[in-house]
Amino acid sequence: MSDALKPLIGAAADRALSRAEAEDAFRILFEGEATPSQIGGFLMALRTRGETVAEYAAAASVMRAKCNAVKAPAGAMDIVGTGGDGKGTLNISTATAFVVAGAGVVVAKHGNRNLSSKSGAADALSQMGLNVMVGPEVVERALAEAGIGFMMAPMHHPAIAHVMPTRAELGTRTIFNILGPLTNPAGVKRQLTGAFSRDLIRPMAQTLGALGSEKAWLVHGSDGTDELTITGVSWVAALGPDGSVTDMEIHPEDAGLPVHPFEAIVGGTPAQNAADFKALLAGEASAYRDAVLLNAAAALVVADAASTLQDGVEMAATSIDSGAAARKIEAVAQITQAT
């Protein structure tokens, strides 16, 4: 342990840190050179003052540098949310990832176990027969052979173990609640990313731009969900190739889809969510299907595989109804269970 973090704690409480200062601070955290009290003091100093884009980018860049990286094919994208919205919805981003892969876009999905629902991405995929506790080599094989791979966050970010006990003791949101979607181990340049707060979508989009992303949509639903919602309007901060961020609103009708009540997309246990996931892949009409079609359409636009949301919905529906999305699940399950 050292006292290297101490001056940065005081600085963080008084003013915004430069990116270099913030990188130094997070390097100290991730290398285990700070005490639990120092870690807690630093994280709460940031939270109380309010984190900046430079601080988000610094934390994410250090995490990326220390992760167990995955080599992904060019053009791969991530479809992920921060979690933490407290809404307990069905596994929309997880299902969306396989539908998008079934439409021909490589998806390197980063995720974890449940945070805001009874069933997070890893919980759902485990129920679907995948072994989520695999390392980079298996993920790379899945990406190469199946066109989609799942990266379980703790398997790729071991340095985070230095801060986990303090995070648990603090029991409140910190900068780490948004770092997951910013630290994809495959270094993807395109993202459809949900946030638990509308206030986060623009700074997160700016952060991804600072980290080198080419195109990303950061989204938040008006019902509080961390994805494009099928229940009403969603807000989007769209990062363009030139680094600009454009604010947009998206309604289900923009994609030719109906509006559904929130109750129709509420999830349950991992087993219940997996049953709904399987029904969706089998072609069952539902609010869940429409929510996935909307998010898949957006992802396909971000990937430049579709030019409009309406075109994206058609591609996503074909992915489901042709069985392509279901075959992606089967392929990844076989690859991950063979290890």
Swiss-Prot record:
Anthranilate 1 binds at G81, N112. SUPFAM superfamilies: Nucleoside phosphorylase/phosphoribosyltransferase catalytic domain (SSF52418), Nucleoside phosphorylase/phosphoribosyltransferase N-terminal domain (SSF47648). This is Anthranilate phosphoribosyltransferase. It catalyses: N-(5-phospho-beta-D-ribosyl)anthranilate + diphosphate = 5-phospho-alpha-D-ribose 1-diphosphate + anthranilate. The lineage of its organism: Bacteria, Pseudomonadati, Pseudomonadota, Alphaproteobacteria, Rhodobacterales. Mg(2+) 2 binds at D226, E227. Its cofactor is Mg(2+). PANTHER family: ANTHRANILATE PHOSPHORIBOSYLTRANSFERASE (PTHR43285:SF2). 5-phospho-alpha-D-ribose 1-diphosphate binds at residues 81, 84-85, 89, 91-94, 109-117, 121. Pfam families: Glycos_trans_3N, Glycos_transf_3. Pathway: Amino-acid biosynthesis; L-tryptophan biosynthesis; L-tryptophan from chorismate: step 2/5. Catalyzes the transfer of the phosphoribosyl group of 5-phosphorylribose-1-pyrophosphate (PRPP) to anthranilate to yield N-(5'-phosphoribosyl)-anthranilate (PRA). Its EC number is 2.4.2.18. GO terms for biological process: L-tryptophan biosynthetic process. Homodimer. GO terms for cellular component: cytosol. Belongs to the anthranilate phosphoribosyltransferase family. InterPro entries: Anthranilate_Pribosyl_Tfrase, Glycosyl_Trfase_fam3, Glycosyl_Trfase_fam3_N_dom, Glycosyl_Trfase_fam3_N_dom_sf, Nuc_phospho_transferase. Mg(2+) 1 binds at S93, E227. The keyword Ribonucleoprotein does not apply. One of its GO terms (molecular function) is magnesium ion binding. Anthranilate 2 binds at R167. NCBIfam families: trpD (TIGR01245). It comes from Roseobacter denitrificans (strain ATCC 33942 / OCh 114).
